[in-house]
Each structure stands twice: as C-alpha cells, then as structure tokens.
Amino acid sequence: AHKIYGPKGIGLLYIRDGVTLTPLIFGGGQESGIRGGTENVPAIAGFGVAAKIAFNQMRSTMRHEIALRNYLIQRVLHEIPFCQLNGSHQNRLPGNANFSFEHVEGSSLLMMLDAQGICASSGSACASSSAEPSHVLTAIGLSDELAHASLRLTLGRNTTKKELDLVVSILKETIDQLRSISDSYLNRISR
C-alpha cells in the first residue's frame, strides 16, 4: 500500500481460481487459511482509502509525473556530459527515469547523494539490492560498467519542479566530484 501513499506493511494478494497456495504461517485460519494471525484492520482500511484516492487521482497524477519526468530527463541529458537515459524515451512508467553516467561508480554516487538527502537507487527496480549488474539493464544492451553506473530516480504525485532543480544541481556537483578522481574520465577529457 505504501507505493500508493497508503500504510506500510499491508498489501493485496489476488489468487486466481484454481491456484493453491501453501501457507507460510499457520494458525487460526485467517485470510482464508493462507496466513494465520490477527488481521491488521486499520491498515486494511487505510489501504482501501489509499486505493480509492489513487484511482480518483490517477489521470492527474500521471500527467503531473510525466511532465516532471520529461523535465528531469531533459535537464540531466543536457547538463551532464557522458550520460544516457536507459530504456525508451516514450514507453516508460510516468514517474521513473533511469540514467547511466560514464566514469562514475553507482554505489559511490548513491552514498554521496544519500548524504545530501537525495533518495535514489542503482540498477533496475528488479535488482536494486544485488551486487551483480542489473540483468534488466544488461538485457537492454548496457555493458556491466554502465549498468553499475546507473541511477534510478522516481517521482510521485507530490514531487515539485523546485525539488527536481535541486536534485539536478546536486547530481551535477556530485558527478563532477566523482569524475575528478576517476582516471578513466581524466584520461578521456585530456585527449
């Protein structure tokens, strides 16, 4: 539910007719015998309210996220050299932008951004906790090096243009710092 601004720790599992699941937690038969334990009624109700709000605001949220995502992509691609957008420019989630920055290690970039209050992730959403390069990014043709140098930024319905301006400013400064100690970058620009 937290993905749609609802409470954390509650979700929904749709089970198609004919599919049998084995419970991980046995107990009193709650949740149709799929998971034992007391159901969190306030969280369930909160999820329901969040779903209703998300549905009612879906079109306006999408328009808002698409406009800001396109603004972010345009600024990053035009202001940070040796950068690329990963994936399609058009066919992508409204609030998602994934970039790769040559001559930058993704984990160092993440730590430095985090220290400045910027929440981001490296790789794809499917593999953000893995030390291996994202199989999604390598499947779309990125080298292991570029997959490791990727940064995923996501936007939401409350994101503002002013926040994105700050993110781009901090991102540029941080990448400049990291590249200033990168032998491959220094060799490339000295040619």
Model-derived regions, located:
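A short linear hydrophobic-aromatic micro-motif
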Residues: F82-G87, A120-S124
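Solvent-exposed alpha-helices and their adjacent loops that cap or buttress functional pockets
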Residues: I4-P7, Y14, P23-I25, L77-H78, ...
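Structural signature of PLP-dependent enzymes
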Residues: A51-Q74, Q84-L93
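Active-site PLP attachment segment
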Residues: A1-V49
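PLP-dependent enzyme catalytic core of the Aspartate aminotransferase-like
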Residues: S128, E132-R191
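Conserved C-terminal alpha-helix-loop-beta "cap" of PLP-dependent enzymes
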Residues: A97-R152
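A general structural signal for well-ordered alpha-helical segments in protein cores
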Residues: P7, V41-I44, A51, R69, ...
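Hydrophobic C-terminal alpha-helix "anchor/cap" residues
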Residues: V76-L77, L113
